């Protein structure tokens, strides 16, 4: 147990899906998992473990932003022996050709945060996905004939920014989308020697003023969920050996 998670050792699977919204975790458990059991309700950050395609998988909310993702992912890696975390969430598409409901598989994560300062590195760290998980996700998206993009995202500490041009500047660097958690997950995984992947669905196009509804974000972005669950169920075998 930790201050934020009432689960006991063994309650959580080796691979965990992490949506930002704990209600999305509940939806995934009730919709996709067999024999799902709730292992955490502390602070309303719901977590469940069940079976997907006969493989043991967990899903737990991360909350919004890098500090929250940093706390929950750190505890999962260090206190519960989790080997891989797959973030599933929403992002604002900013690159040309990225459309609403497209999947974005984050190969790397830029950030405006000083999250990496804690590591006292003598230079700049480039947070990246675990290639094995990314490769599985790309293969799954292709097999399902889904619209997806692979590339950089930018993880921002700021949702309501004071500078209107920042998103456009990231676009110039080929960044696909903006969100708020991936860089923290990738850095936490790297420091722990574990694996991580971020799969997001484009819920907004901030440079065009287009968006989806909050209800749709919670309950209908099932393509992302199914890709992540497939990757998780296939990855479990490698960690259970």
Residue spans for each PLM region:
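Flexible, glycine/charged-enriched surface loops at secondary-structure junctions
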Residues: 34-41, 145-151, 236-241
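Generic non-transmembrane alpha-helical segments
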Residues: 136-144, 188, 227-238
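Metabolite-binding pocket within alpha/beta catalytic cores that recognizes anionic/polar moieties
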Residues: 1-127, 131-135
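Generic structural signal for well-ordered, non-membrane alpha-helical segments
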Residues: 18, 25, 65-69, 126, ...
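A C-terminal functional module that forms or caps the active site or interfaces directly
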Residues: 164-205
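Active-site rim beta-loop-alpha module in soluble metabolic enzymes
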Residues: 124-173
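His/Asp/Glu-rich mid-to-C-terminal helical/loop segments that flank catalytic regions of hydrolases
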Residues: 206-241
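Glycine-rich beta-alpha junction loops
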Residues: 22, 92, 109, 154-158, ...
